[in-house]
Amino acid sequence: MIDKREPVPFEVYEPGVYLHGTKADLAVGEMLVPGRESNFEAGRVMNYVYFTATLDAATWGAELSAGEGRGRIFVVEPMGEFEDDPNVTNKKFAGNPTQSFRSREPLRVVGELVDWVGHSPEKLQAMRGGLQRKEPGQIED
């Protein structure tokens, strides 16, 4: 039986597997590259591509990114060096418990998770409210 539960914060999806949540229509083999518009701030070009090792963080990306329809979660492979995402590292929690990363190098799409479960409507509404209170440019690009 497959466990159909909400994602658990800080729980690594599978060791060595990286995820990217978005509403973009991507295919296996495509590259995610820096230099595209932010999913969270209209008109802002991003210098990095972001990804995570946790299903929870990828789910937030899929649910909160710009665009219509249901989000998607892709399995990605970093094509170069990457670092802890400074937007979340050592902020609310010590270290990088969300296992969130960024890179100036491309990420290759190697698969897609198709049967993931999203956050509850209440959690989603609370997160959207928190993001609306952030000042433009508060997230490093």
Residue spans for each PLM region:
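ADP-ribose/NAD+-binding catalytic cleft of ART/PARP-like enzymes
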Residues: M1-V49, E63-L64
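Active-site and NAD+-binding cores of ADP-ribose-processing enzymes
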Residues: K23, E30-M31, A66-D141
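Short active-site loop/helix that positions an aromatic residue
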Residues: L55-G69
